[in-house]
């Protein structure tokens, strides 16, 4: 079997040039995705259709030859499986029934895995469809980020509703995060059992938290997920991405036990290099460079490679690729990383 380069890095080794994949690499910037999406019905229908979900997962692999495929799904399938009436509307994003204390008391996780069984079928299909050398990544949302949507009922600019709820109802918040951690760990184990080589935990809203809350809401629940997964699957490889965490990332790595940490584009490369001394890092090109292209893109790629290319690095963006990105810029990115990534 060919070597899966992402897995080599997750084992703490340096690969030259570094492997590359992109968060949200299957998405609206690709014309083939938009075509498939049209035939799926709703966005959640696409997530729960193994044939179409595996097709859109494979599209960027076919087009760009990336080193990893990431399961096409959404972090909000967990609240959907908890019967929170999740929906997605064009231009408005996700919505669901906002949860309160009594709703948290009534949450029933008994049929979550059955509800998510199409996702596991998608993972199984992908493992048989992907080239041998391509790493298959599963994922889930971190409890804090998922909770922000559950509490507000939709996305908000600074997650004020969830932050306020945490201050006013700390016991209920703790209960919600604990349940989400438990369900998420089961979900990741099932993805690994279905064929995922490694998994990523996305904490997209970690950056709105103060230091104390970051410890309680970002670090502890993710550490709980990782410990639970490892108790059952000791060799599991896990990437944890806490967007906006800044200098708290050092604590985050040490306390969660993640094999690699994802870095957003605001993390200074000098600090990223320090973090890399403790283990693999993933990131951290600004997604806007995939829209801008040109010299700005080339300089951005080279800066990341120059700073981080001599250690264990999975090259990625600092957050998801945007719908405005030019697919040609992804081609240029992959070519540049593979030609320059071995130099220096």
UniProtKB/Swiss-Prot annotation:
Catalytic activity: uroporphyrinogen III + 4 H(+) = coproporphyrinogen III + 4 CO2
Pfam families on file: URO-D (PF01208)
Any single GO BP term: protoporphyrinogen IX biosynthetic process from glutamate
Keywords, ordered alphabetically: Cytoplasm, Decarboxylase, Lyase, Porphyrin biosynthesis
Chain positions of site Transition state stabilizer: 74
Transmembrane region(s): none
Cell compartments where the protein resides: Cytoplasm
Pathway linked to the protein: Porphyrin-containing compound metabolism; protoporphyrin-IX biosynthesis; coproporphyrinogen-III from 5-aminolevulinate: step 4/4
Residues the entry annotates as binding substrate: 24-28, 43, 74, 149, 204, 319
The UniProt record lists the keyword Lyase: yes
Enzymatic class: lyase
Superkingdom of the organism of origin: Bacteria
GO MF terms held by the record: uroporphyrinogen decarboxylase activity
A GO CC term assigned to this protein in UniProt: cytosol
UniProt xrefs under CDD domains: URO-D (cd00717)
EC number(s) on file: 4.1.1.37
UniProt keyword Cytoplasm, yes or no: yes
Family of the protein in this entry: Belongs to the uroporphyrinogen decarboxylase family.
Subunit structure: Homodimer.
Record's function text: Catalyzes the decarboxylation of four acetate groups of uroporphyrinogen-III to yield coproporphyrinogen-III.
UniProt name for this protein: Uroporphyrinogen decarboxylase
Native species: Agrobacterium fabrum (strain C58 / ATCC 33970) (Agrobacterium tumefaciens (strain C58))
